[in-house]
Amino acid sequence: MLSSTAMYSAPGRDLGMEPHRAAGPLQLRFSPYVFNGGTILAIAGEDFAIVASDTRLSEGFSIHTRDSPKCYKLTDKTVIGCSGFHGDCLTLTKIIEARLKMYKHSNNKAMTTGAIAAMLSTILYSRRFFPYYVYNIIGGLDEEGKGAVYSFDPVGSYQRDSFKAGGSASAMLQPLLDNQVGFKNMQNVEHVPLSLDRAMRLVKDVFISAAERDVYTGDALRICIVTKEGIREETVSLRKD
């Protein structure tokens, strides 16, 4: 049997310059995050807001369930969409709901959409060293009754938008929203206010298109429509393969 020196020696090779693997401590890696797929989207109108998500919960090429909507009703005027690691989504929404109950008992009123967004920012920032693996989008009505959408990064930075997509198919949905809702970089186009009917048609169309291309998005589309009358839900079937 050849020695290691004989095996790796060759003309012109200086073994003194070769990297050597030294014995070291055994390292155990902790990887708590799993991406469970799914896509969320929110659009704000003049007097309404829409928060939508698909219902597929998957891991790799396995589908855990086909009925796991990612839209969570927080108040009569606010809905949050969460996508990413499903365990963190559930934990985060339970924390938010507990904070909202405490606020209502203390102040005898529901928290506003803007205040919920600010609260979520502090919750996410408090976990900045071990962040929740969640894409968060809040949609609802502000204090003036106008539609509002707030998008977040994993550690709490947030901003108010008119529309936003997040999750596995966000790279496909966001350009469509930029074009059809935001009219970004378009010339000689009249910026017509978005009606609820047109927004609903657009949400359905973009999710149908996303389900054709993204394996982590599909099964069904759950749409939450927030108006001054309250929140109503609508479900649309998507492809299931």
From Swiss-Prot:
Phosphotyrosine PTM sites in chain numbering: 150
Residues recorded as bearing N6-acetyllysine in the entry: 204
Result of changing residue 103 to H: In NEDMHAL; uncertain significance; results in impaired proteasome assembly
Modified residues (Phosphoserine): 62, 68, 162
Any one annotated GO CC term: cytosol
Record bears the keyword Nucleus: yes
Single GO BP term: proteasome-mediated ubiquitin-dependent protein catabolic process
Modified positions (N-acetylmethionine) in chain numbering: 1
UniProt signal peptide: none
Lipid metabolism found in the keyword field: no
Cross-referenced Pfam families: Proteasome
Pro-piece positions: 1-28
Record family assignment: Belongs to the peptidase T1B family.
Protein's recorded name: Proteasome subunit beta type-1
Gene source species: Homo sapiens
Lineage: Eukaryota, Metazoa, Chordata, Craniata, Vertebrata
Gene that this polypeptide is encoded by: PSMB1
